Amino acid sequence: MNTPAQKKITIVDTTLRDGMSSVSHQFTPQNVADIARGLDRAGVGTIEVAHGIGLGASSIQYGFAAATDPDYVRAAVDAVENADIAALYVPGIATLAELQKAIDAGIKTVRVAVHCTEADCGQQPVEWAKEQGLTVMTFLMMSHKLDPEPLAEQAAKLDSYGADVVYVVDSAGAMVPRHAGDRVAALRQAISADIGFHAHNNLGVGIANALTAAENGATFIDGSLRGLGASAGNAQTEVLAAAFERAGWDTGVDLFPLIDTAEHIVAPLMKEPQIVDETALILGYAGVYSTFFHPTKRAAKKFGVPARDILMELGRRGVIGGQEDMIIDVASELAGRTYEIPASAAV
């Protein structure tokens, strides 16, 4: 039973965006509708829908999706009664034209994601989206790479552009609770916008990180049903709901419909259990972007070198999202041979 003394937290679900990475972006529009309907019935207020990398990412580089982003968005919009549908926009991958298509399909919220040192790359899409009347959430990806104070300086830029929410994003699953709490606390001192936290579970502390982020001032927390997401996956939406309720927070969601949606709709669609295997663990330990998970496994098999060695070297080099081509470079170097592009693939 809710009381006025309860603290409020907003859970945003990303099963239909980050979770796409776990199913090779192959959810169908019907799958999207079924999952969105379940989340809506449970009271989730914002549901993120798109290709796993975001709008406009369906390609040979990131993997082709089973449908277009507008098709996914329309399927979700038609399935819900109360929830807002959101989409992810990554500058350099998406374009404003693609964002307009998502708006036409029915999104009410856009989530603009930039590398944690490059908040200025978000100015154009944030300001443009605000002009279109969208709620704008912003992501500082790979937030573990900056100490709290410089991260807060980047957040202040996004705040100045008009962002409604600024997220600390643990893209690599490299944080432990102290890291999450310190960064959120620094943002709370620096910006007037609301603060969000997006966890990955590579070190097994996604839920703990989310709880600590909330205790330090985050009011928006991302999750995905069954933890579905890149590499080790995200904080699990249904577990977040239960844990926050046990910790005395009002989530505004109904736990049992969340569990039902996770168990009876999402689980049968999963290719494999969302676990912290060796590659996922080392990815978090090395601080490498979560989408490197499957390409690294493929490169390890192709070149006959351990995935852990590839990831540790990538971490040492400080690679970020968008530098997936470095996986082949590192794997070939570790194997002691030069990789040549097949003639059939040459342009």
Swiss-Prot record:
Sorted UniProt keywords: Aromatic hydrocarbons catabolism, Lyase, Manganese, Metal-binding
Chain sites annotated for binding substrate: R17, D18, S171, H198, Y289
GO biological process: catabolic process; L-leucine biosynthetic process
PROSITE patterns per the UniProt record, alphabetical: PYR_CT
Residues binding Mn(2+): D18, H198, H200
Superkingdom of the source species: Bacteria
Top-level EC class: lyase
UniProt catalytic activity: (S)-4-hydroxy-2-oxopentanoate = acetaldehyde + pyruvate
MF GO annotations: 2-isopropylmalate synthase activity; 4-hydroxy-2-oxovalerate aldolase activity; manganese ion binding
SUPFAM superfamilies according to UniProt: Aldolase (SSF51569), post-HMGL domain-like (SSF89000)
Domain Pyruvate carboxyltransferase span(s) in chain numbering: 9-259
Site-annotated residues for Transition state stabilizer: R17
TM region(s), chain numbering: none
Keyword Transport found: no
Enzyme nomenclature, EC number: 4.1.3.39
Protein family per UniProt: Belongs to the 4-hydroxy-2-oxovalerate aldolase family.
PANTHER family: 2-ISOPROPYLMALATE SYNTHASE 1, CHLOROPLASTIC-RELATED (PTHR10277:SF9), HOMOCITRATE SYNTHASE-RELATED (PTHR10277)
Protein name: 4-hydroxy-2-oxovalerate aldolase 2
Naturally occurring in which organism (per UniProt): Rhodococcus opacus (strain B4)
